[in-house]
Structures are given as structure tokens and as C-alpha cells.
Amino acid sequence: MSEPIENLTVDAELDAVGLFCPEPVMMLHQKVRDLPAGGLLKVIATDPSTRRDIPKFCVFLGHELVAEQAEEGTFLYWIRKKSD
């Protein structure tokens, strides 16, 4: 990543706090679909399985996982939608 997380400008945010698999990834799929190409999405989740599922989602669909961070049971992800 070329710049610090706090300097990233997000285009949308997905709050998946309190949701469990498969809901966070299902919501992520819809939210990414609504983003413009190259848009940056911040995801906030509490389900530990997102640590596995979200990186795989990005690889499988060609999106960039710009950054991820874990803070006291909360998992944060910054995802850049692939260019069309």
C-alpha cells in the first residue's frame, strides 16, 4: 500500500458489525457491485471468518484488498473495485 490507511478516501462503507457468515460477504458483493470501477470500499465486520472470506472474495473476483486491520474483535478492510 502506498499511503497510510488514515489518508485513504473511501467512496462507500459497509457496516457488517454483528453479522455472521455468509451475510457479510453477501452484503459485500452487492455493495461492490454498486461502486464505480476503481472505487474504494471500507468494510467493518466482527465475524472472524471475514479474515478468511474477504481476502478470498477479492482474489476470486479480481478486486484489490488495499489494507486490512484488526482492532479488539473488529475487522476493517479497504477494498478497491477492479477496473472494468
Swiss-Prot record:
Keyword Cytoplasm belongs to the record: yes
GO cellular component assignments: cytoplasm
Residues at the active site: C21
PROSITE patterns reported in the protein's UniProt record: UPF0033
CDD domains, per database record: SirA
A GO molecular-function annotation: sulfur carrier activity
Function as written in the Swiss-Prot or TrEMBL entry: Sulfur carrier protein which probably makes part of a sulfur-relay system.
PANTHER family, sorted: SULFUR CARRIER PROTEIN TUSA, SULFUR CARRIER PROTEIN YEDF-RELATED
HAMAP family, A to Z: Thiourid_synth_A (MF_00413)
Record protein name field: Sulfur carrier protein TusA
Origin species: Pseudomonas syringae pv. syringae (strain B728a)
Chain's gene name: tusA
